[in-house]
Design a protein with these regions (language model features):
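Enriched for short, Lys/Arg-rich terminal
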Residues: 1-17, 23, 27, 31-35, ...
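Mixed-charge, polar/low-complexity N-terminal
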Residues: 3, 44-45, 70-72
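Hydrophobic residues in alpha-helical segments
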Residues: 33, 40, 44, 64-65
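A short, highly charged nucleic-acid-interacting micro-segment common to nuclease
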Residues: 42-55
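A structural signal for well-ordered alpha-helical scaffolds and beta->alpha junctions
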Residues: 54-57, 129
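A short, surface-exposed loop/turn module that caps and links secondary-structure elements
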Residues: 58-90
Length: 186
């Protein structure tokens, strides 16, 4: 999963960076999962935090890099016309991972993922899309590709160190997530 220059993460030929907002969320979730594992080595795999971490890793480092331009990641006008170029991956009904990509350079930036305080809920003040739009309007994360990439490259060594650490306690959960078959269309 690592490659390119030292400290970078490369998956399916795409270099992946994480904005500091995403890194902070990923780090907090890893700490939470590790604490749960130390308290309950057998039962932590069934906890929401462990499943969420496994889903985030699977999306960010497996599914999205397979085809970041996929129509399943288009978010339409939910963020407003000015932010239509942002993509989002849905997981566990109310969670969204927001990202951008640049095809020519084969680069993906994972920008932000909502948490339990900002679950997707139509017309809620704390809705994931509404919260992310506020973050974009405040300039953090930046909307400009160049500024977003610059802000995210500073954390690439942290991401490279954190990703295997995060993957270790969630490997069993991740295998279960990968083997789930999608529901058949009606």
């Amino acid at each position: 999963m690592t490659g390119g220059r030292p400290g970078t993460v490369v998956c399916h030929g795409w270099t992946i960076y994480a904005h500091p907002l995403f890194l902070a969320q990923l780090t907090a979730l890893v700490v939470e999962v590790e604490a749960q594992k130390s308290k309950d080595a057998a039962g932590y795999l069934g906890k929401n935090a462990t499943k969420r971490l496994a889903a985030m890793l699977q999306l960010g480092f497996e599914k999205i890099p397979q085809n970041p331009a996929g129509s399943e990641y288009e978010q339409g006008g939910t963020l407003g016309a000015e932010y239509k170029h942002w993509r989002r991956a849905k997981f566990f009904q109310q969670y969204r991972l927001f990202f951008r990509f640049h095809s020519r350079s084969k680069t993906i930036v994972l920008a932000w993922v909502n948490d339990d305080d900002t679950l997707r809920s139509f017309d809620s003040k704390d809705d994931a899309y509404r919260t992310f739009r506020k973050l974009l309007n405040s300039g953090n994360p930046p909307d400009s590709w160049e500024d977003l990439l610059k802000a995210s490259q500073s954390g690439d060594t942290t991401l490279a160190k954190l990703t295997p650490k995060a993957a270790a306690p969630t490997a069993k959960v991740g295998r279960r997530l990968k083997t789930k078959k999608p529901p058949k269309p009606h």
